[in-house]
């Protein structure tokens, strides 16, 4: 088969390269900083994988398919890269997003529980539910060990024959012709291919500034880890699930591998440069600390034991970008993970590999034409 060049070895690019290689393509995977690096949107220790997406059924189905593929992959590599912690969706009495999530889970057939306030307090007494009146519990969902998972996918891709190149590439296709013939690395190497897939997250607007500079938005995000008291396992799995409180734009992950109790504000931060931005956390500390004291009283005075700065790479509304470059028929643009994309890597890799190999119609929500210049988030 004709050679394919994938630029970006994050979760999207790694799974695309892996799927293409397994279907017989000769694949070269290029990344400037390495799989799961700290500058990437796929870096960091952990990510939640949950099935609930409000009324957005396509993402529920993709997440469910991805969980199946992740688990099968980890059985061959490292089963500890997925932790079945369960995921708890906290809801106020009137909560349209969680109500529509419940309906979608029921329609698709995803295992779940609808829990009353009394059931919540009985099962998780270490949580002060405050205004939370009910919740959805997804018992089979959980946590992916993000950085290590990406490294594992790239490692398996190499075993399938993928050539990995650590390098930057030229910032845009040359302005002549309808086909891109090669990309040039920072060292001057020309990597030729028949198809080029740019799945490089927050670097997409830097590589294609005229096309994506005002359609993909990289934002600065903080993740904080607090240390539970010595010997207190109430905030570690299995006593504590991963959880989401969209009413206050917070989410968290139980203490896994002694890293601490992870909590973050799920609100788009200021613009951020993934190459040069300083990664010193602290801007969201006060808001997170106040929430921690309210919802998890035993952690009121817990010390901050670690912090990370990463970035989302957002589309205008949270839908992914999967489309051909409008000027180059053999160039694909894949990104817009928008803070929720990591979990979908396996299903997205299947989808893109099939489009590249077989053609077909791209779902309208993923098309470049739907990417506006103003952010108005609709996918959570």
Describe the function of each predicted region.
Residues 137-195:
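Helical element adjacent to the flavin cofactor pocket in flavoenzyme catalytic cores
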């Amino acid at each position: 088969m004709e050679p394919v060049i994938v630029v970006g070895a994050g979760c999207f690019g790694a799974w695309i390269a892996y799927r293409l290689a397994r279907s017989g393509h000769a694949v070269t995977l290029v990344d400037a900083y390495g799989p799961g690096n700290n500058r990437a949107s796929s870096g960091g220790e952990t990510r939640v994988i949950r099935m609930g997406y409000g009324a957005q059924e396509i993402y529920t189905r993709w997440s469910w398919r991805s969980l199946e593929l992740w688990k099968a992959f980890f059985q061959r590599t490292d089963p500890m890269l997925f932790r079945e912690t369960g995921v708890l969706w906290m809801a106020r009495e009137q909560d349209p997003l969680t109500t529509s999530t419940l309906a979608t889970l029921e329609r698709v057939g995803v295992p779940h529980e609808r829990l009353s306030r009394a059931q919540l307090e009985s099962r998780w007494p270490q949580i002060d539910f405050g205004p939370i009146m009910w919740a959805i519990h997804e018992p089979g969902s959980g946590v992916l060990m993000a950085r290590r998972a990406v490294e594992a996918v790239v490692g398996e891709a190499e075993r399938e024959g993928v050539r990995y190149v650590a390098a930057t590439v030229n910032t845009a296709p040359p302005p002549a012709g309808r086909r891109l013939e090669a990309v040039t690395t920072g060292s001057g190497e020309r990597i030729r291919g028949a198809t080029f897939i740019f799945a490089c997250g927050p670097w997409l607007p830097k590589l294609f500034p005229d096309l994506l500079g005002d359609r993909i938005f990289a934002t600065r995000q903080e993740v904080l880890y607090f240390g539970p008291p010595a010997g207190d396992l109430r905030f570690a799995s299995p006593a504590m699930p991963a959880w989401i409180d969209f009413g206050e734009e917070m989410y968290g992950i139980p203490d896994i591998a002694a890293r601490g109790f992870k909590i973050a504000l799920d609100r788009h931060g200021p613009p951020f440069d993934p190459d040069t931005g300083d990664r010193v956390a602290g801007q969201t500390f006060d808001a997170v600390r106040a929430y921690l004291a309210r919802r998890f009283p035993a952690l009121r005075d817990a010390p901050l034991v670690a912090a990370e700065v990463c970035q989302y790479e957002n589309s205008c509304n949270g839908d992914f970008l999967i489309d051909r470059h409008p000027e180059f028929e053999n160039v694909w643009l894949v990104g817009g993970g928008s803070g929720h994309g990591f979990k979908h890597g396996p299903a997205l890799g299947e989808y893109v590999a099939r489009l590249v190999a077989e053609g077909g119609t791209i779902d309208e929500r993923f098309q470049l034409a739907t990417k506006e210049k103003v952010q108005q988030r609709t996918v959570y």
